[in-house]
Design a protein with these regions (language model features):
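Short N-terminal binding/cap micro-motifs at the start of the first secondary-structure element
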Residues: 12-18, 47-48
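Mid-domain Rossmann-like dinucleotide-binding core that forms the NAD(H)/NADP(H) cofactor-binding site
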Residues: 127-184
Length: 184
């Protein structure tokens, strides 16, 4: 079976340009024991993607040239040799910019079915972005009704959710963003 994959060929200098990422078609490897094959159906394209292409270690290990471009995905398990995961289950993981990924199950999260939430919510409000906003605001600051909450990067993914949670909690919310256009 063939797998289309975006490969980091060189570290971009400034803006990403042709040739930094290349679309390749490779064979999907056979599974070993305790592995799963996931067919990706959603890919989260995030500002962090550009930072990961720097070759520098940050909160995650640095990418190397030749790596599949890193990215969060939602997918369906197509094949399983892992006792925890069953064929047909929907999961969230760092599956990368590719049609299929093979995983040993580490970092793979099963998405509950029958919740009524669209799947893409598990990559935003019910995923890392939403959890960062929720716990970062409510566990760290404990905002109270009537308080003023100042949010930097308020136009960003996490910041915009922090603003909404602040409003729900009864705060006066002041958002800061990097440009006039982002403030509109």
């Amino acid at each position: 079976m063939k797998n289309k994959q975006w490969i980091l060929k060189k570290f971009p200098v400034g803006e990403i340009s042709d040739g930094d990422l290349v679309l390749e078609e490779n064979e999907v490897p056979s599974l070993s024991d305790s592995q799963i094959l996931i067919r990706n159906i959603y890919l989260s394209l995030d500002p962090a993607n550009r930072g990961w292409m720097s070759g520098q270690k940050s909160y995650v290990d640095a990418m190397q040239t030749g790596d599949i471009m890193r990215g969060g995905t939602i997918g369906i398990i197509e094949e399983s040799k892992h006792e925890k995961f069953k064929i047909g289950e929907i999961v969230n993981c760092m599956g990368g910019w590719q049609q299929y990924c093979v995983s040993d199950g580490k970092g793979v999260r099963q998405i509950p079915q029958g919740t009524g939430f669209p799947l893409d919510c598990y990559m935003s409000i019910l995923g890392m972005t939403g959890l960062t906003a929720y716990f970062g605001l409510l566990d760290i600051t404990d905002p109270q009704p009537g308080e003023t909450l100042v949010v930097s990067a308020a136009a960003g993914a996490v910041g915009s959710i922090v603003c909404q949670i602040g409003k729900i909690k009864g705060c006066r919310v002041v958002g800061i963003a990097g440009s006039d256009a982002k403030c509109k």
